[in-house]
Amino acid sequence: MFTISGVVLITRPVYDEGSLNYCQSGAMNNGILLESVEGNKPRYSIGGAEPIGTINANAVLTAATYAEDVKFTDADPLNGTRVAICNGEDTQQEEMGFQGGALGYFAYDVGRRLEGYNDLGIEDWAIPDLAGSSYEIGVSADHQNDVIVLIAHASADGNDVFITSSRQLSMVAGPTCCASGDVEILRNKLHYYGVIPFSQDDCGFNRLKDYLGSGDMYQVNLGNRNVGAIVMTLFQGYNQLRLMNPGPYMVFLDEANIIMASPEIVLADEANDLNTRPIAGTLMRLNEQDEDGVNAACLGQHHKDRAEHMMIVDLVRNDLGRVGRFGSVNVQEIVGAENYSVVMHIVSRVTGSLNEAFEAMEIIRAGFPGGSITGAPKVRAMEIIEELEPQRRDGWGGSIGYIAYRGNIGYRIAIRTLFACNGQLFASSGAGLVGDSMEDGEYNETFEKMRALRSFFCAAVHMGKTPYLS
């Protein structure tokens, strides 16, 4: 154990992939976990506990607090986030992963406040537009070196704070506990409701085709919502989702009652290198590996999916261009197929170098919400989504991630995501519609994207009694 620039560090070997579960131990409150489980995953999984500042926003006002005092209120949700992270210290330690900052989520509906279009959707869930915290204790699991680094911020001159921080870290740095106990079979059933965009009765699909035919937009992503009852603790649900639908961007966000297994990063900034990996174009996976390979080749050549994907690549390239240095934005990988638990997607990678005139909030503003969850052109697609989808999207289609004190950011699109509210879970899935889309095919795509999450509701869950399963 040692201190550098007011930071207490403890390293431990990674005993297993669940070592970050300390965030939900009895001593930790309002924990958050951003975990990389499999696939094209980043180097670090990160978590936080013991929040020292919070950010919350509703449809009108954003409030940032620090040490329990309200420090800032504003109509702009990004300004509140800026205030929440400015109290932290930039430790400037290389190769240490996440060293403190703000972790949380921006709901899709923050986009309405940023763009100023009409509010038409029904607000049927009491979910904040924004919820996050800045953390006193952080953890980074380094997948490259197979170690966990636990971090607490403390004044190098303040012995009392140093001792307290050291004790806190030592307490959570012990051997990993694992879930155990009897198995209970949970037989929840999801049901669809409010599927107006794909309903013949409302002709929502036909209205959308009219918009596409008239040139209002070239593509729009419409979604279906699914609802089921909560029959387990949220962290039990996270552990089960982690087993059944592992992905590169897993999230457990206790404060906002969110669990996620997203495959898509909307934007990241590491040392002024911008990176985004848009996903658009979907095909169901088959059981045989050889058939997967054939389908992957077909997916990349399918004219509808390829056109859908290229529109989104162009859109996110323009988004990065708003904050990138002139001439630095490039498409590094294009139209590659990636396999996930039940589907394969077309994925590309767009990169750029940050224009140093901009900082984290401007990067988020430039790319929010993600193009693959909205459409092209983005603002017009968002207006049409507001008209055709009956309820607000709330968290679905927003972003979950972190803004580090040192300025690095990493945000994932909130798809393959479950939200808990009022004793229920809800999840949504969408499909990108273009001029030659067929209604049945697009509806089936939204249904198949939910396959892993539907299985989640009917799975066997370990009802353990370990501290983090409270």
Curated annotation (Swiss-Prot):
Reactions catalysed, semicolon-separated, are: chorismate + L-glutamine = 4-amino-4-deoxychorismate + L-glutamate
> InterPro entries annotated for this entry?
ADC_synthase, Anth_synth_I-like, Anth_synth_I_N, Chorismate_C, Para-NH2Bz/anthranilate_synth
Q: Name one GO biological process term.
A: L-tryptophan biosynthetic process
Q: Does the keyword Transferase apply?
A: yes
Q: What Enzyme Commission number(s) does the record list for this chain? A: 2.6.1.85
Tell me the route in metabolism or biology where this protein functions.
Answer: Cofactor biosynthesis; tetrahydrofolate biosynthesis; 4-aminobenzoate from chorismate: step 1/2
Q: What is the top-level taxon of the source organism?
A: Bacteria
SUPFAM superfamilies (UniProt xref)? ADC synthase
One molecular function GO term is:
magnesium ion binding
List the keywords (alphabetical): Folate biosynthesis, Magnesium, Transferase
Q: Which Pfam families match?
A: Anth_synt_I_N (PF04715), Chorismate_bind (PF00425)
Cofactor(s) needed by this chain: Mg(2+)
Indicate the enzyme's highest-level EC class: transferase
Give the protein's biological function.
Part of a heterodimeric complex that catalyzes the two-step biosynthesis of 4-amino-4-deoxychorismate (ADC), a precursor of p-aminobenzoate (PABA) and tetrahydrofolate. In the first step, a glutamine amidotransferase (PabA) generates ammonia as a substrate that, along with chorismate, is used in the second step, catalyzed by aminodeoxychorismate synthase (PabB) to produce ADC.
Q: How does it assemble?
A: Monomer. Heterodimer consisting of two non-identical subunits: a glutamine amidotransferase subunit (PabA) and a aminodeoxychorismate synthase subunit (PabB).
Miscellaneous remark of the record: The catalytically active amino acid residue K274 of the E.coli enzyme is missing.
**Family listed:** Belongs to the anthranilate synthase component I family.
Name by which UniProt lists this protein: Aminodeoxychorismate synthase component 1
Q: Which organism is it from?
A: Lactococcus lactis subsp. lactis
Q: Which gene encodes it?
A: pabB
